[in-house]
């Protein structure tokens, strides 16, 4: 069968798709990945075939403008909450109709439409009409995928990159909407998708918002309990092209700690919520070897202690198995890779998307710790947390338990037959096509 993956131009989101894309390709299926032109080179470096759609997204420039306009981190978080972009809310008393309506109003206008502009959707639909994929697998923020599937009749699945905030919030939204009078049931996401689909002569169904099914790489015990049908998937780390440095082949002389704030975070968000100076200061006095994946900009004006080795990039999939602990910002790639290798984690959450929820889950399962007051912590706080991870055996034991759970979850290769079956069940008549209004 033909399988089309779609994502907006964020390298970390595309990397989350690569293991499954390759599993399908090595099973004999034709695979393409569609994204904006600024991701094309990164896609082709994976050995997969890229399809350029829309104009360059220039995500880094967009985020820099947003950050410059909002100010410091506290102001950014406060502004996002006031704008209704807090999809992370879980407290029942806070999940009112006004809150969830505000979430979908702001997220649709500021996130979904910006990551998936009209031109991109047009191009994905045009390619899908021509190529006729049987299955479209889409990043949870890339609605061009389900729109193209609805227009062409392809089956479609949402592939998560972290916890299913969208699915959970959408269920809450629909439950609260049912309690409203018909004339008070605003639905910004549905309205946008209905208008978009109408341009191609297609109609909205709720599955366009959340997928016909979801492929979920989060360990089963850590998933949000959503009603959406899902296919469990073992997370397989993919770090892109890399050469393993010679020093990494040698066993560490002391307990090794990885300090990373994420490549995607520094490339896109142009800054770090955590103070790198405070992080390094906290580690300087400990009898450990630190490998810090920090670039020249992050290290500017800083004198590194003797026990800290700074490297611009090293694949975490090769580094973390040699580590006794990892300190990071809560990004999905680092979080999942550490779980896959059974490494205790200290999270300094950057408060983006699901990082605070992952931190809480990790601490609840006894597999790590996080800084509860991320804006007010000291070097001693960091040292105390890290020493607990290194000295208390329960953290490594609980990490090993989660790792066993992940190993027991079906791999990308294992789920290919199920995806073939689901595609056959959900794919519609290939004549189910529309045209953009005004086209002849």
Curated annotation (Swiss-Prot):
Its EC number is 2.4.1.327. It catalyses: dTDP-2-deoxy-beta-L-fucose + aclacinomycin T = aclacinomycin S + dTDP + H(+). One of its GO terms (molecular function) is UDP-glycosyltransferase activity. The keyword Transferase applies. Pfam families: EryCIII-like_C, EryCIII-like_N. InterPro entries: EryCIII-like_C (IPR010610), EryCIII-like_N (IPR048284), Glycosyl_450act (IPR030953), Glycosyltransferase_28 (IPR050426), UDP_glucos_trans (IPR002213). It comes from the Bacteria. One of its GO terms (biological process) is antibiotic biosynthetic process. Keywords: Antibiotic biosynthesis, Glycosyltransferase, Transferase. CDD domains: GT1_Gtf-like. Involved in the biosynthesis of the trisaccharide moiety characteristic of the antitumor drug aclacinomycins. In the first reaction, AknK catalyzes the transfer of 2-deoxy-beta-L-fucose from the activated donor dTDP-2-deoxy-beta-L-fucose to the mono-glycosylated aclacinomycin T (rhodosaminyl aklavinone), forming the di-glycosylated aclacinomycin S (L-2-deoxyfucosyl-L-rhodosaminyl aklavinone). Belongs to the glycosyltransferase 28 family. This is Aclacinomycin-T 2-deoxy-L-fucose transferase. It comes from Streptomyces galilaeus.
């Amino acid at each position: 069968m033909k399988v089309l993956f779609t994502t907006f131009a964020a390298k970390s989101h595309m990397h989350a798709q690569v293991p499954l894309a390759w599993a399908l390709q090595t099973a004999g299926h034709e695979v393409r990945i569609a994204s904006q032109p600024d991701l094309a080179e990164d896609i082709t470096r994976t050995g997969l075939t890229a399809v350029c759609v829309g104009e360059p997204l220039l995500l880094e420039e967009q985020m820099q403008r947003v950050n410059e306009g909002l100010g410091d981190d506290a102001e950014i978080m406060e502004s996002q909450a006031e704008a209704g972009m807090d999809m992370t809310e879980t407290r029942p008393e806070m999940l009112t109709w006004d809150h969830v309506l505000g979430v979908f109003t702001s997220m649709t206008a500021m996130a979904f439409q910006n990551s998936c502009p009209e031109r991109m959707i047009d191009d994905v639909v045009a390619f899908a009409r021509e190529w006729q994929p049987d299955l479209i697998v889409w990043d949870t923020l890339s609605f061009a995928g389900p729109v193209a599937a609805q227009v062409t009749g392809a089956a479609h699945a949402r592939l998560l990159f972290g916890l299913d905030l969208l699915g959970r919030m959408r269920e809450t939204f629909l439950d609260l909407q049912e309690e409203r009078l018909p004339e008070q049931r605003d639905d910004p996401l549905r309205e946008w998708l209905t208008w978009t689909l109408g341009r191609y002569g297609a109609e909205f169904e709720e599955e366009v918002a959340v997928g016909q099914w979801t492929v979920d790489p989060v360990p089963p015990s850590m998933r949000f309990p959503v009603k959406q049908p899902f296919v469990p998937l073992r997370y397989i780390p993919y770090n892109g092209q890399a050469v393993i440095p010679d020093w990494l082949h040698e066993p560490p002389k002391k307990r090794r700690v990885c300090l990373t704030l994420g490549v995607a975070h520094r490339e896109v968000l142009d800054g770090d919520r955590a103070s790198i100076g405070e992080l390094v200061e906290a580690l300087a006095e400990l009898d450990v070897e630190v490998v810090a994946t920090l670039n020249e900009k992050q290290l500017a004006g800083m004198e590194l202690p003797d026990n800290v080795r700074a490297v611009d990039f090293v694949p975490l999939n090769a580094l973390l198995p040699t580590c006794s602990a990892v300190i990071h910002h809560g990004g999905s790639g680092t979080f999942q890779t550490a779980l896959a290798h059974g490494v205790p984690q200290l999270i300094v959450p950057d408060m983006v998307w699901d990082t605070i929820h992952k931190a809480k889950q990790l601490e609840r399962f006894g597999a790590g710790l996080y800084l509860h007051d991320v804006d007010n912590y000291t070097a001693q706080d960091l040292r105390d947390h890290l020493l607990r991870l290194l000295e208390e055996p329960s953290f490594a034991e609980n990490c090993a338990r989660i790792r066993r759970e992940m190993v027991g979850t079906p791999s990308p290769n294992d789920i290919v037959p199920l995806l073939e079956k689901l595609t056959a069940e959900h794919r519609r008549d290939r004549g189910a096509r529309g045209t953009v209004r005004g086209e002849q």
